[in-house]
């Protein structure tokens, strides 16, 4: 749904906003927002301008937190709201507009890396009953020898140290993840896990800002996963990425644990259907869904190259908040690919007129060397050269001109041709003055935009050059549509005649 990516504009306009003068007591405010640690971060780095980014639910405390930081550090603070793409992402663009030296991001986060400005995460400390969480864990996993990975929402990172103490003495094979960020208040105090993380080997797993180490000879699929937090995008992201694992969760809001019964196979079938739609597409729209995640420009260029190699046409769209009416304006686009942070990449496109896929799904559709194995990637940085899931195109030989393959669409049942052009043809794609002939002496030069135009029932106004008489320009009407200036005079003259 569109709400998974951005808030509904109608809901924002109709929302009732109440003023809260005493949102948190002063003592709780310093503890919740970890003001001493934030001030220490600012003063130790000699920052003079600081951008404070608050999600909507924490904005009532923004003024008090800002005043406290300015009083302790003498630095100038600027309060920022959510980005156009979601509250989990850091708004580096707005911070640069005010000339900030660093950013302090409050609340939940997708932990996507940023490169422009120094960044400090303050996740806050949501309440959680650690003993009840441990009790639910023991009920869900009665076998003390179970291999389990513990993941958590970042807002509960403050309690993971206590939970690890309660579990590791009883469950020797439990692996507790830790946050892996450049700067985060409190995260540095959390120990690695029950299993030592100091060794740098292949057993260390890094995913969505979490890091843990599994035992030698095992994979993540050999473990069950216990997640601490509410049902949401973070949990869905993990379940899609590790779709062969059995998930359980503990909701601190209700203090209840359960085995997750989300039909991941059904969700993967929907995504595979979107991949088939991408294979059938001729014109692809690249949606820019982030301006702050590191390497987003690199993945856009890689997508352009991949789409071009597959014989498709691509256009890039940077339109801020994405909604159905905006995307419906471009009928020529067959499918969209969204470049966003991992938590906002899985956009349910059922409401849109055209499907919206992820960069991983687009590469599956365009790169025949990447095969569907059940592995699912939502972090586009893993698709870049050097990433764990990078699959490049082979370098074309000098004698090769074009390699054509024929495929059958699983949706329409029609034949479709997939061509991988040589580098020379790619660099000369801007001109079609000279084209190569194949062995049957037929010239083939397809254009997706021209094909779409030829298939439309109405192709625009026909110029009919030389067939229409040339006339002088005449004075048009003045005013607004509800009442032009000449209309009033005509009505008055008509009444006089009557």
From Swiss-Prot:
A Gene Ontology biological process term: protein histidyl modification to diphthamide
Residues where [4Fe-4S] cluster binds: 89, 110, 341
GO cellular component: 2-(3-amino-3-carboxypropyl)histidine synthase complex
Keywords: Iron, Iron-sulfur, Metal-binding
Pathway the protein acts in: Protein modification; peptidyl-diphthamide biosynthesis
CC cofactor note: Binds 1 [4Fe-4S] cluster per subunit. The cluster facilitates the reduction of the catalytic iron-sulfur cluster in the dph1 subunit.
Family: Belongs to the DPH1/DPH2 family. DPH2 subfamily.
Protein name: 2-(3-amino-3-carboxypropyl)histidine synthase subunit 2
The gene coding this protein: dph2
